[in-house]
A protein has these predicted regions:
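Structural alpha/beta surface segment adjacent to cysteine/selenocysteine redox centers
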Residues: 189-271, 276
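Extracellular/periplasmic catalytic domains that process cell-envelope and extracellular macromolecules
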Residues: 29, 126, 180-184, 211-212, ...
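N-terminal targeting/tethering segments
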Residues: 22-132, 208, 220
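C-terminal cap of thioredoxin/glutaredoxin-like
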Residues: 135, 139, 143, 159, ...
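Short, low-structural-confidence N-terminal segments
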Residues: 1-62, 68-69, 151, 155, ...
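Thiolate-centered catalytic microenvironments shared by cysteine-dependent enzyme domains
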Residues: 162-167, 217
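Acidic/polar surface patches and capping/hinge elements
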Residues: 103-126, 140-164
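Core regions of peptidyl-prolyl cis-trans isomerase
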Residues: 41, 76, 129-156, 234, ...
Length: 348
């Protein structure tokens, strides 16, 4: 069964354009048709895409989100209507009948009611609240039973939403990559911040993904140091300084593992990796790699990415600290779309 997809969200960008878009899945067959006329000048979607590529992508992505939500909700409605017809009742009667059959008939114990009462911290006396508490508990149980019933119906059905998302072709120029394989069918691009706790939390899932999908996935990391994290900028610079000595990823992994980002610790980490510490210290103190970090940050800002981690997986946008199960599902779908087999190590 296909569960509700992770719905990408991409915001309107500035005119600083660093991405090329390949979103013909939701675009008209041609961008050359006239869609706007201003004072006799005829303009096409191609004109809009040239002026505001991220804005057009945002519009198509917003449509994709709305479309997939509507289709997913329609699938649930359809299943309920079909089941109701089989039982010769309305959908409302179907849900009510099922809930009544599983929700306990008796009242909760007096102790349970008083525990609930204490939890709401009401100024009203218990006796005045008792009837309301009972009704709230009953309604909560009914809602839970109905929700579980719907989930059961969905789990027994095959639901496949065919709407295809718009995709962005993210440039990997001057971007650290690993897990590189010839013609790897999946590319995961992460915008992240070394001081972001969610970026630190998602790293084990990415590591596991790299191990189990070896040769199938290429990983890229782009810097997006957030203003509220005082150590993030220099930590990113330090990783690039290590990269200048051929140990970007080793240093990258150490930063996310130790979570200690003071300047003194950054330099100590360089020594632990047996880098040329004199050259590293000079690189870090002089801000030699500051522009490299700022360039990737500017790219993220042009997309108006507002949080980390943010991912582009084969061009589709996902936001937040995805779990391994979520990442695996996305990658498996990408492999399926590319006709590449899922590795045995990743099968469950």
């Amino acid at each position: 069964m296909m569960t509700k997809p992770f719905l990408p969200l991409l915001l309107f960008s500035s005119s600083f354009c660093l991405l090329a878009f390949d979103d013909t899945s939701t675009a008209p067959s041609s961008n050359n048709g006239v869609v706007l006329e201003v004072d006799g000048t005829k303009l096409t979607l191609a004109d809009l895409e040239q002026k505001h590529p991220f804005g057009l992508f945002q519009a198509r992505n917003a449509f994709y989100q709305a479309e997939t939500r509507a289709l997913d909700e329609f699938a649930t409605e359809y299943l309920l209507e079909q089941q109701a017809q089989k039982e010769h009742v309305t959908v409302e009667e179907l849900l009510e009948r099922h809930a009544n059959s599983v929700v306990p008939k008796g009242e909760p114990s007096e102790e349970a009611l008083r525990l609930y009462y204490e939890g709401i911290e009401s100024k009203e006396p218990f006796e005045a609240m008792r009837a309301g508490i009972l009704e709230h508990i009953r309604q909560s149980r009914m809602l839970k039973a109905k929700t579980e019933y719907v989930q059961t119906l969905r789990s027994k059905a095959h639901i496949a939403v065919s709407a295809a998302p718009p995709r962005a072709a993210v440039s990997l120029k001057d971007t650290p990559v690993r897990g590189v394989a010839a013609n790897a069918p999946v590319t995961v691009v992460e915008y992240a911040d070394y001081e972001c706790p969610y970026c630190q939390q998602v790293q084990p899932a990415l590591d596991k993904l790299e191990t189990e999908y070896k040769g199938k996935v290429t990983f890229a990391y782009k810097d997006l140091p957030l203003p509220m994290h005082p150590h993030a900028q220099k930590a990113a610079e330090a990783a690039h300084c290590a990269g200048a000595q051929g140990k970007y990823w080793e240093y990258h992994d150490m930063l996310l593992a130790t979570k200690k980002l003071e300047i003194s610790q950054l330099k100590e980490d360089a020594g632990a990796l047996k880098l040329d510490t004199k050259a590293f210290d000079k690189c870090l103190d002089s801000g030699e790699q500051a522009e490299a970090v700022k360039a990737q940050n500017a790219e993220a800002q042009s997309l108006q990415l507002q949080g980390t981690p943010s991912f582009f997986i084969n061009g589709q946008f996902f936001s937040g600290g995805l779990t391994y199960e979520q990442l695996r599902g996305i990658v498996d779908e990408a492999l399926k779309a590319s006709s590449a087999p899922v590795p045995e190590a990743a099968k469950r």
